[in-house]
Structure formats: C-alpha cells, structure tokens
Amino acid sequence: FYTSYNLPVSIIRPFNTFGPRQSLRAVIPTIITQALSNNKTIKLGNTYSTRNFNFISDTVNGFISTIGKKNIFGEVINIGSNYDISIKDTASEIFKLMKKKVNITEENFRKRPEKSEVEVLKASGLKAKKFLNWSPKFKGKAGFLKALEKTIKWYSIEDNKKKFKNNIYNF
C-alpha cells in the first residue's frame, strides 16, 4: 500500500514475545508451568526448531519507538532479540534456572503440521537499529536468561498460578 498508494504505513514484526501473563498455549509458559507442577517429564512438540524469543518489555519498547517516525514508512522492521535458541535448549535453561531435573517427551499431536512448521525463525535487528535507534535490553544469552528468571518468578507466585488452568494445555 505504501508503494502503490503512497499510504504512510510500515510493517513492524515482533518475534516470539514472552513474559509474565502469557497464555499457557505458548511454549515458554507451557514448559515453566509443567515444571512447577513437579512433572518429571514434560510434553512438547518439535523441540529442534529455533526461535528468537523477545521479552515483553523489549517488544513494547520496540513498538513505542516507532511512534512519530516518518522515516519508517514503507519499511518492514523486525523487533527481536537477535538471539536464537532451540526449544529443547530453552527447556534445558528453564530447568537449570528452576533447579529441576525433568525429561522432555516429544508428542506428535503437539507438533505443527509439517508444511506449517518453521524450523528456524531468526530476526535481524539492523533496520530497528537504523530507523528506530532501538535494540533489545535483554540481549544475548545473558539477557535471555534474565528474562526467563523474571518470567519464572511471575509464574511461581501462588496468586498467579491460580489465574491459569494448567490442565487445559498441559495434559
């Protein structure tokens, strides 16, 4: 629409946002809540896909940084952490932070259909830096682990546990 009609629009693409209050349908809360339930084995779909997880505050700040920017019209800008990690390694890091010994079982019915699975989802932050002067505060592995700690802490609070029906998605 920008090219065809000179409409002042941009596409802002957030990558795999996670953090407190997220639905248990998403992989990180699924892993955390299954581990909090003291399950010795957790059930996941494809554990080898890699993702570029982005902590919620970074995603929000990325969107806020677009306000009033006219230099982004016609651009596609990624809001991501630029740190890639597999689902399996994400689960392992969560278990380490929670001091839990847990096994992972892959279940076929939890996997996406083969033609819809994205094996590698990677964000480039070059345009976000160039046009928005934005980069994530939770950078690299250290930033990812810090964001996971905040997320685990939130899901570990008893009052917060009551807000979610763990048995609906984590059966």
Task: State each model region's role.
Residues 5-8, 32-43, 97-109, 125-126:
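A short C-terminal helix-loop "cap" of Rossmann-like NAD(P)-dependent dehydrogenase/epimerase domains
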Residues 17-30, 37-42, 56-57, 65-78, ...:
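Glycine/proline-rich active-site loop of Rossmann-fold NAD(P)-dependent oxidoreductases
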Residues 2, 36, 67, 98, ...:
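Protein kinase-like catalytic domain
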Residues 56, 76, 110-139, 146:
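Conserved C-terminal active-site "lid" loop/helix of NAD(P)H-dependent oxidoreductases
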Residues 1-20:
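Conserved beta-loop-beta element that borders a ligand/cofactor-binding pocket
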Residues 46, 75-77, 86-92, 99-120, ...:
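C-terminal "lid/loop" region of Rossmann-like NAD(P)-dependent oxidoreductases
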Residues 59-63, 79, 90, 128, ...:
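Non-catalytic, hydrophobic alpha-helical segments
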Residues 141-171:
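Amphipathic terminal alpha-helices
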